[in-house]
């Protein structure tokens, strides 16, 4: 692989642009396409991720236009994916699912065997259609299809561990909520077309290049963590498409990769002066700028403040980003944005943040 040498400032500036933080994109589907999905575990955060990039709230695209699909994807968490790319993600997720193992500890925790889980997954594909079903209704239908009343307890658990394999195979996605009740539908029935995953080789290659195009330069360990499995498969992907990749050395540190088609653009980013990619940016919770890649986060978060950003139970805080670093965390309190600084900010930068937040005021703490 050809090698390019860049600085961290060039990297953070380039990544801000690739993540649509320096240009407005009104279409939430285009945002989801660029970002490799929009986080949707917390609905308000997903809306914020789209809106900070200039897009409309994704709800209309998801539930009315059906151009976005809400489903379990990376790391087994809910994301909004472009409906016309579901075959890509299903192909890669199905391949990931094929590598799962179910040790006795997993079976004890979830109350089913690996064989049971495969049967449940097949049954989900058989009973779901275009009519939304609640978790309770889906559990009852699966039990009836399999003749297994003993599955009532395991299927009722709130985290969906027994339903995620069906999502990976493209047999299940979220339907519109019924009040406070989540529902599920068949993606094929919901979209009115067959959903057949791409072959694993094609899908994995495309997922790797997509990730690097928006989060690179990154390591294969970064890819694996984002995708939700061990590093070995990501290393295989990188070896299989080595001709499409460029090695990147960042401030003398090697081990990073970027798509070869992006290498020239990355190297051309200026290292000095001011740049739109320097921010400031007020990013919502679970923003992809923070989530991936981890190798960037250890440079972006001030020493001793990792737990302010990545909190208990996997919660990723809303952050203030300045010059490629997390300068603070924030939350909303009525008509105020309360910013808790993790680093000192010049007065001019504070004024820029206040202008960015208008008409909402900023309370500095």
Regions found by a protein language model. Give the residues of each.
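A short acidic, leucine-rich amphipathic alpha-helix
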Residues: 135-143, 166, 220-224, 324
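Non-catalytic regulatory appendages
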Residues: 244-305
């Amino acid at each position: 692989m050809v090698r390019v040498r860049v600085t961290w400032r060039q990297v953070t500036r380039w990544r801000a642009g690739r993540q649509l933080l320096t240009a407005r994109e009104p279409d939430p589907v285009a945002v989801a396409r660029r970002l490799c999905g929009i986080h949707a575990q917390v609905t308000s955060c997903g809306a914020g991720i789209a809106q900070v990039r200039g897009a409309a709230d994704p709800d209309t695209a998801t539930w009315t236009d059906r151009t976005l699909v809400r489903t379990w994807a990376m790391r087994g968490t809910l994301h909004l994916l472009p409906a016309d790319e579901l075959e890509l993600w299903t192909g890669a997720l199905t391949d990931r699912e094929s590598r799962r193992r179910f040790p006795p500890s997993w079976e004890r925790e979830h109350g089913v065997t690996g064989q049971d889980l495969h049967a449940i997954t097949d049954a989900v594909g058989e009973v779901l259609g275009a009519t939304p079903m609640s978790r309770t209704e889906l559990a009852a239908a699966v039990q009836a299809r399999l003749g297994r009343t003993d599955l009532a307890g395991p299927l009722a658990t709130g985290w969906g561990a027994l339903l995620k394999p069906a999502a990976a195979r493209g047999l299940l996605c979220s339907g519109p909520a019924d009040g406070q009740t989540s529902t599920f539908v068949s993606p094929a029935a919901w979209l009115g077309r067959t959903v057949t995953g791409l072959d694993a080789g094609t899908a994995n290659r495309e997922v790797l290049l997509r990730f690097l195009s928006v989060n690179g330069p990154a390591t294969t360990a970064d890819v694996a963590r984002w995708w939700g499995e061990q590093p070995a498969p990501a290393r295989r992907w990188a070896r299989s498409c080595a001709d499409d990749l460029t090695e990147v050395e960042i401030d003398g540190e090697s081990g990073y990769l970027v798509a070869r088609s992006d290498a020239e653009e990355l190297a051309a980013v200026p290292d000095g002066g001011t740049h739109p990619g320097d921010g400031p940016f007020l990013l919502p919770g679970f923003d992809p700028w923070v989530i991936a890649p981890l190798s960037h986060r250890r440079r972006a978060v001030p020493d001793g403040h990792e737990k302010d950003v990545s909190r208990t139970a996997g919660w990723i805080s809303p952050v203030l980003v300045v010059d490629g670093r997390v300068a603070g965390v924030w939350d909303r309190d009525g008509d105020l944005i309360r910013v808790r600084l993790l680093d000192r900010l010049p007065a001019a930068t504070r004024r820029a943040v206040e202008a960015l937040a208008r008409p909402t005021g900023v309370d500095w703490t």
